[in-house]
Structures are given as C-alpha cells and as structure tokens.
Amino acid sequence: MAKADKATAVADIAEQFKEATATVVTEYRGLTVANLAQLRRSLGESATYTVAKNTLVKRAAAEAGIDGLDELFTGPTAIAFVQGEPVDAAKAIKAFAKEHKALVIKGGYMEGRALSIDEVNRIADLESREVLLAKLAGAMKGNLAKAAGLFNAPASQVARLAAALQEKKAGEEAA
C-alpha cells in the first residue's frame, strides 16, 4: 500500500471514528466473505462493518482522539462503526457471533470510553431506546392516572356527602 493510500485510509477511518456514536471491535478469523456480507446486511443502516490493517486503525484512532483501544487491535480485526442506535448494532453483532463462533467480540468504544466485552454484551441485552421510552411513558401515564384519581376523590366524596345530606333532609321533612 502506497504512503498516500495509507494516509487516505487513516483519514477515512478517523472520520468514521468521529462520526460514530459507538464502535464494536471484533475478530473475524475463520469467517468467509459470504459470512462478512451476511453480517453487514444484518447491521443494515445502523452501522458499517470495516476490515482494516491494525496499524492504520491505531493511527486513525489516535488522530480521532480515541484512547484505550490499542490492545484490541491484534490479529484479524474488523470494526463496526455505529451511526444509529448502539443497542441495535450490538444486538446484531451478538446474534451473529452466537451463530458463527468464528466471530469474536473484543470490545468497543462509546461516549468517550473503551468498553469491555461484558459491557458490549450488556448493551446488546438492553431493549431499544424506543421500547424503553414507551415503557417509561406507560409508567408515567399510569402514575398520572392514579394521581388524578386521588385529586378527584375528595371532590367526589364531598359531592356524595352533600347528596346524602340532601336525601336525609328530604327524608326528615317528609316524616
């Protein structure tokens, strides 16, 4: 690879690091080209899966201000640069790794810090942002309905008391 090509590749990878909301670093030793294509399809629009030389990736990470990933760049390494929801991409990679034992998750990077294998797996086990927001909204709606019932209860109790007193007076006057 010519020096100019390397500089271009480093700049491209650094740009991907900067634009990504998260990255997942994997080892793809033993996977076929068809397997890699299948993984890329499963990631869809949420992430791009890139295979690059470790030395170029290390330089690009340093250029992008990413620290703590150098030890992950050994052996055949590929990186998923996540543009969408990190949970969706992590789920897709974890599911693919479960089917294809050759794919090994090495770690990742999100919100300014390196992630361990366990942290990437925990992110994959989370529900998507939309599901969590829906659950939160449902919980809030239920609590708001209870609060409205509590606030309305004294008024309705007063109204029932007034109606009972009115009936009692009407009964006393009739007698």
Curated annotation (Swiss-Prot):
It comes from the Bacteria. GO terms for biological process: translation. InterPro entries: Ribosomal_uL10, Ribosomal_uL10-like_sf, Ribosomal_uL10_bac, Ribosomal_uL10_bac_type, Ribosomal_uL10_CS_bac. GO terms for cellular component: large ribosomal subunit. Keywords: Ribonucleoprotein, Ribosomal protein, RNA-binding, rRNA-binding. The keyword Lyase does not apply. Transmembrane segments: none annotated. It holds the Pfam family Ribosomal_L10. One of its GO terms (molecular function) is structural constituent of ribosome. NCBIfam families: PRK00099.1-1. Part of the ribosomal stalk of the 50S ribosomal subunit. The N-terminus interacts with L11 and the large rRNA to form the base of the stalk. The C-terminus forms an elongated spine to which L12 dimers bind in a sequential fashion forming a multimeric L10(L12)X complex. PANTHER family: 39S RIBOSOMAL PROTEIN L10, MITOCHONDRIAL. Forms part of the ribosomal stalk, playing a central role in the interaction of the ribosome with GTP-bound translation factors. Belongs to the universal ribosomal protein uL10 family. This is Large ribosomal subunit protein uL10. The gene is rplJ.
